[in-house]
Amino acid sequence: ILFFVLIPLVLTFTLWLPHTATPGTGASTGTWFHWVKVYSALIGCVGFMLIRYNKEWSSNKYALLFPPIILSVNILEACIRDFQVYGLHATGQVIDGVVMMSGPWNIMNGIAGILNILAISGWMGIFISKDENQDMLWPDMLWYWIIAYDIWNFAYVYNCVSDHAFYAGAALLVSCTIPAFFIRKGAWLQHRAHTLALWMMFTMSVPAFVNSPRWGVPASHNPQALFAVSFVALLANIMVITYHIWKIFKFKRNPLKKEVNIDEPAYMDVAREKNCFD
């Protein structure tokens, strides 16, 4: 509550609006995307806490729709921004405080993000761990979807805020993907929401950090690199959605009613914990 409700409310009116993220001033943190992103991430954190610590919510099939909906909204926000940047027809100008390069990579990556949304499944199988952490675990969200998401998200940051790609892209993604693979399998979305919300709060409070000579990691803004990264993102998500659709039809699993990946070892590794307590 302190980190994801009280502090953001105080920062909104004492720092962000009047000083560091004022809309319409040309600041990189003053765009619609940054404001929507920080609050959608915070809403995700609060919603996940309600599911984790309220038994009625964690067992309510309608409440379990919240995680895929807020995840889809977050992805869609970035897709819209990618398409918007394409429409700017930028060729290296500073727009909204960052260097912009528009091109087909924006369209490719926007499509990749939409495919990533379509491959989300199995939210009805979300459950809360019985240990003291009470983690929100999603067995059907497997490693290959997470990798496809990471590639897409890095491509988005590289396309739309290139000079922030090291921190907001690579470092931020690794911070939740490594735990999901090696520490707490199944809890990726919970970790993603927390790390994203904290990063957005930090960057809106100290926007100069990523552009400072000491800490900044500037991008090359090379059109070939932009194209290559978005091409890989699109290819990865085409592969994931193709496999997803194949499984749906082969095993006759309606993704709106049941989990799709119940035969996967990675699914079983997470679901086994639920079965131990059922």
Which residues fall in each region the model found?
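An N-terminal, globular interaction/scaffold subdomain
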Residues: I1-N60
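Juxtamembrane "helix-exit" motif on the non-cytosolic side of transmembrane helices
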Residues: T14-G24, C79-G87, W152-S162, A208-V217
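C-terminal transmembrane-bundle signature of multipass membrane proteins
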Residues: A168-F277
